[in-house]
Amino acid sequence: MLPYMDQVLRAFYQSTHWSTQNSYEDITATSRTLLDFRIPSAIHLQISNKSTPNTFNSLDFSTRSRINGSLSYLYSDAQQLENFMRNSTDIPLQDATETYRQLQPNLNFSVSSGNTLSSDNTTVDNDKKLLHDSKFVKKSLYYGRMYYPSSDLEAMIIKRLNPQTQFMLKGVSSFKESLNVLTCYFQRDSHRNLQEWIFSTSDLLCGYRVLHNFLTTPSKFNTSLYNNSSLSLGAEFWLGLVSLSPGCSTTLRYYTHSTNTGRPLTLTLSWNPLFGHISSTYSAKTGTNSTFCAKYDFNLYSIESNLSFGCEFWQKKHHLLETNKNNNDKLEPISDELVDINSNSRATKLLHENVPDLNLAVNDIPSTLDIPVHKQKLLNDLTYAFSSSLRKIDEERSTIEKFDNKINSSIFTSVWKLSTSLRDKTLKLLWEGKWRGFLISAGTELVFTRGFQESLSDDEKNDNAISISATDTENGNIPVFPTKFGIQFQYST
């Protein structure tokens, strides 16, 4: 479940029109969410409150070998921040948990053509962005957290300098470990690419990240084309000035929708040339209430590989319509009446409706124009061909929009998350749901291997309380035991 302060941070980005989908740090966020989700390791309770429209606080308790806790405080001067925040009772489950991330396409519109090539939704978004840029006011966010009984501190400051740039400062201080780390981020987002300069006092680490979006131009024949694909390429470079340790990686991401079903899918390919590590992922929404992800890792130097799988199963409310109870994931064919209804709600007509019927317009042609019969037949054939092609584009767009609207309008009550790795022989199970105003997460991680305990450190053995009998080892039995188990409760007002 997404922590409360992360929800506030996401609301701050939304209120200040800062997109996180262009960040190289989150380029593989979908696969990480479906495969590497966090399992609670103890009984955890989080109570949060919005004391004023601009201040938020949170209190955490956990019982892991002893009672631990933390106190968090956040302040922001963003005026519309409260419009994006909801308490634990009202927030939709799909917004309170990390799940499949749907991206917005990056369209390249010509300046001279204005909005003639843009879709209705994109036009509205561009108008909002232009209005925001013209009336931009600098916004800030201040966050602090103190842990007890260790008295560790962490802090974060975010400054929106202008509509395209942002400055972030993060700090961690630990008296017990004599650790004090300060990290600075300067980000510049030009919509087509996002550049990020990073400096950390730990090893005097310097870093540079960049993510470039290959913008696509809509068709000249389509004044309302729903562009459903996005291609991005990013890279990062690191250098520790003290140890002179370099680091780098690059990732390619492709996001699109299936034109037949409207279901989104994401493909990524990552490469680390220094360590010879190659990773590829495939993530897809297989239905309105199910998601699947597969990841393959391979190392060029050690010839080691790993295959991981992850999936999600969402449960809706039981009082749905009878027609949708048995066919939650079945997309019905779009009828002509539905297309006409959707067209009336848009400012721009559908494409095939803009094509004139030459058979009806032949009487309106001036008598001075004498069109031969064979040319008239050719024009009619071309009109029919273009009309059918444009109708197909409209139906594909309507299918994609229908699938997205079906997910957004659904009310989910719980979700099951499963993840497994063939090399590590682990199985992670997580259940997340809502109950009487509480957001609940409960899960466990199971291990199916004999030599797993030897690979763990002493701290992990003590924390997880793992013990394997000598009889199982001598007999060669493969033990099945949980390395983690916990439950987490969140409540916010």
Curated annotation (Swiss-Prot):
Protein name: Mitochondrial distribution and morphology protein 10
Entry note about domains: Lacks alpha-helical transmembrane segments, suggesting that it resides in the membrane via beta-sheet conformations similar to those predicted for other outer membrane proteins and porin.
InterPro entries: Mdm10
Keywords: Membrane, Mitochondrion, Mitochondrion outer membrane, Transmembrane, Transmembrane beta strand
Gene Ontology biological process terms in this record: establishment of mitochondrion localization; mitochondrial genome maintenance; mitochondrial outer membrane translocase complex assembly; mitochondrion-endoplasmic reticulum membrane tethering; phospholipid transport; protein insertion into mitochondrial outer membrane
Similarity comment: Belongs to the MDM10 family.
Protein location: Mitochondrion outer membrane
